[in-house]
Amino acid sequence: DCFGNQIQTKEDSLDCIDWDMINPATGPVYVEGAVAGGALKVTIDNIEFDAQAACATGQDEGVCGDRFDKWSVALCPVDDKTVRWMDKLDLPLRPMIGVIGVAPAGEPVNCGTPGSHGGNMDNTAITTGATLYFPVACDGALFGCGDMHSVMGDGEIGVAGAETAGYATVTLTALPELKIANPVLENETHFVTIASADTLDQAADIAVHNMLDIICSRTGAAEDEMTMLFSLIGDVK
């Protein structure tokens, strides 16, 4: 999980964990045929979890961190259908992978930071059945993933979801001819461009322009017509 499995009992404190172990990812995996300038296709086939999730919030963390002066931790039992919250609520399981991607171009990027390589995107659409495409910056792609959640809301408001160790089964396919600038996701209902930036406004601009480039280049549609269609059926999240 994102804490490196360091929170296992109610006595474990986030004040005492090794923060260098935060957001670990399994990898890197060298993918034969993946070349710099191409893309890597990643299909999420299955996600399985351990039997316990750790949740947390604290001072200066997340949206409400100004209200707290210490860390708070909750441990939640997990089964194949629900996450049990505080022995009061059964939350339906919503498996997703928080950290997923390939090696970035240039200097290393820690697993807590998102970018064009993927990384800590914390996107709830990254779940079983989804297919992602990443721009490859170095030969072999060097794929990795981790930071899984058994349930998490969009925005991860308190700084952590239901952080849960487990196993992801994925299928990796090299696409050396595909050119993309940022991660792309598709599932049974949606086609999604994903962008990361210093501000939400900047990220939204990049994602929309990426979508316009992809759709127009593949369909031959006029940019003004497609932009109007975006206003009718497109969503920015």
Language model segments and positions:
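Short peripheral tails and domain-boundary helices/loops at the edges of structured domains
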Residues: 15-36, 59-87, 152-173
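Intrinsically disordered, low-complexity linker/loop segments enriched in Gly/Pro
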Residues: 24, 46-128
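N-terminal, Lys/Arg-enriched amphipathic/low-complexity engagement segments
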Residues: 1-17
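Short, charged beta-turn/beta-strand-edge "cap" motif at the junction between a beta-strand
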Residues: 1-5, 46-50, 137-142, 236
